[in-house]
Amino acid sequence: MNFPYYIAQKVAFSGKKSFSRLIICIATIAVALSVAIMIITTAVVRGFKNQISDKIFGLWGQIHITDASIGQSAEVTPVDMKQTFYPSLDTLRHIEHLVPNKNFLTSKSDPFTPKKTKGGIHHIQVFATKSGIIKTKAEIEGIILKGAGRDFDTTFMTKSLVEGRFIKFQDSSASRDIIISNYTANRLKIKVNDKFVIHFLDQNQQQLKRAFTVCGIYKTGLEEYDKKIAFVDLSMVQGLLGWKKNQVAGFEVFIDNIDDIEPIAEYIHNEVLPNNLYAESLRDKFKNIFEWLDLQNVNEIVIIVLMAIVAIINMITALLILILERTEMIGILKSFGTNNWTIRKIFLYHAAIIVGTGLFFGNLFGLSICYLQEKYKFIKLSETDYYLSYAPIELHLPTVLLLNLATLLLVVLFLIVPTYLITRISPVRAIRMK
């Protein structure tokens, strides 16, 4: 029989009313709330980052293939659609790449080790863009037309449509359909099936006009992009730019797993593309927004550390009160020859029972809040500030299990120090105090 654990159980579940029962109750609640907040924080941060990333990647893909001279001039250099990798690049699955070897400095192994990506490429599509100005009777608004071809993946756009339909392509001529954002529609007071004119400048700075009919209205919540982007037939953009049917601004590549974005981008650039083309990940292209998303990791860590400190302080306080209240018991055990470490283990087991109870109720509360938020979305956000209208939830079971295990081990580890007080208790004095 495990003697310390047996005594700890008897003490913990004795049912005796005392001041320490109140302190234990407070400590249990503190641990429960700390764990619940940790779980909710990790779920919200994970959901927040993934949903915003999905929106950006849904609009633009994860990797762009463009002319190598992009960024060196204001003019966009067209790329020939007839490439050896198009459209067969979407058959690329797992690729092997090299990652730094963490044990390189402590062993004689190679500095890099081979590793396979988690997924591959599931889609590739062409795109082209052209800036213009929408002019209605009431307002004027700048806009960027993004050309969508027949290879356009409509999955994200279908989910983002709040009204109307996607573009209907025509065989004989470019479609006049246009999909505008909800922001643009409200600002210009435009509805589905309304017509309006967009003004452009051609290569010779001559003014062009094109009439469009609104076929759909979308909303991503990314106001920075919703303000600017409208979707039209790719052929329309090619015509406005004076390009041939086989000329586009580039290719958008969609991958299976976001963790593979860097190795796949490097593989495409080094192994697939000719010298005149360049592959760039969206993380590099839109650094600001992804750096902002990465900052959420710092917030997550700060909250978890603070909650861990709260749990530790409350448990230390509770343990010290338990020791002081059980001074007579400690004296009796010492008088029977029980060593200090065995007695310390009794209180550590008792503390572990308290922490375990707190973990149970903390998980129950935290997971319940996550479930209710996922189902009813009762915690609302300002979409203008956060790109989302509600707090997103994405639970990750390994993370939840790790939080529970780390909290239990960390708290119990910190409680070893205050149990040192037991070694200072004299059995004679402890018994006399009673």
Regions found by a protein language model. Give the residues of each.
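Hydrophobic, regular-secondary-structure patches
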Residues: 36, 43-142, 170-171
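Short helix-loop junctions at transmembrane helix boundaries
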Residues: 345, 357-403, 416-424
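Peri-transmembrane interface segments
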Residues: 14-25, 257-313, 322-324
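Basic-flanked hydrophobic alpha-helices used for secretion and membrane insertion
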Residues: 179, 188-280
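Transmembrane alpha-helical interface segments in multi-pass membrane proteins
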Residues: 320-322, 329-374
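Short cytosolic juxtamembrane segments of multi-pass membrane proteins
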Residues: 420-434
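N-terminal Sec/SRP start-transfer signal
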Residues: 1-35, 54, 434
